[in-house]
């Protein structure tokens, strides 16, 4: 009953309100009803009921199982930068691949669709080969000039009165005990360098095991090869390539009469980081840098400097670099020294890298890579050494570099060679920051110091172990090709580079870019031989072309190997 009365009262109040609003003088009129007493009673009853409900609700509680989010920004700038940079790199990679495939596809289609177009395509296919032929002619011309003409008025070069001090650098990663022992032994047995003060610096990048190894490379060196020595750990050794501090283990002693310093890095940061460590240390040691910011912890820097002083080295003149899978010929260091002494303007010299056949001279893998070394790396380095004086790749497995501003200064090591790519850098910059550190170093000081010159010592032979299976071979060639092509592409547009080097760099990049087209052209030649071999054998133009190609490809091998003695006597 109470609820019925309440509803009736609310309806009447609503009607009264409507009537009052509709009245033209609603402000002066008062609405009254006989049921006003019922309204008052109903209101009191309703008020009493709501008061009871509020009293019950005040005693209730609400319990949930939710949890609040952590206090943090809605997005992480570092993560977003890395994600965006990774996406941009993928876009660049796929754009390059699609572009190269499109270009090669068009060339292949033109070559097969329009046979007369070979007047154009032959230029692309033979550009690199033509330059190889030009290199051989230039080498022979310079050899004739040097060997026959200039001997009449050649001046004697003043030799240094005191023997140059040498530091042997051996960067390692995951080499086994046999490789490490062979490399160190080849340094110890070097001939005709006895008067020179010598010091061995071994840097191990991380503490890892290679395939089939029972110990890490650091353990092999410390426990089995170098023997006992004074050991010390520096928790804050130096600032690594990525900008963070690197803990290092240090041991020094004597290895077969030569003082050594072992530096074991806790984490793997790459060979470039190890090279920056050694080169920057020697540069600042020679300068006796004071009040200068370096990558080194002061305690570590002073500790290593003390070891050099105790070894009788007031100053380090030359740094000889090699790889832990390489062995030097017993006259290697001496031959590189002779080239440097003959031309004091040289900043660095590299040796002649040969394949280590390891008792199997007829192995297919070794024979092919030996021929490849001669036709590609050896020929170009000989041309650069004798004609331009700018060997653009000083192989890390055999090099001798002067410790000076042009080679090891902060401008080179910290801003160019030691540059750590940012996540949003271009793809070529990322590649150059990882691969081909040998080319990166030479190109950097050629660009910043255009008058710097380098050379190759053909008699300074180093023997390196080459891959013996497809997996390792393709992995190595991937690193080499990506690094070399990126450096050659940028070298073509950098200041301070000779015009002939720019042209050679562009030809190298173009030859790499049309590799699928080259393979298709070779396949087309094979098909033509199969279909119409009789006609080709009787065609003078075809025979002449094949003979010329054979001469150009075989001659580098002959020049650098069969006539090696003659060339080294000349140069």
Model regions and ranges:
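Alpha-helical transmembrane segments of polytopic integral membrane proteins
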Residues: 133-140, 403, 519, 523, ...
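Charge-rich interaction surfaces and accessory domains that mediate macromolecular binding and assembly
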Residues: 84, 99-101, 110
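Select subsegments of transmembrane alpha-helices in polytopic membrane proteins
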Residues: 90-100, 511-515
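Non-catalytic localization/regulatory regions flanking kinase domains
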Residues: 66, 88-89, 113-118, 129-131
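Membrane-embedded multi-pass helical conduit in multi-pass membrane proteins
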Residues: 107-119, 123, 504-571
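Non-transmembrane catalytic domains and loops of membrane-associated enzymes and transporters
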Residues: 1-6, 10-24, 29-36, 43-51, ...
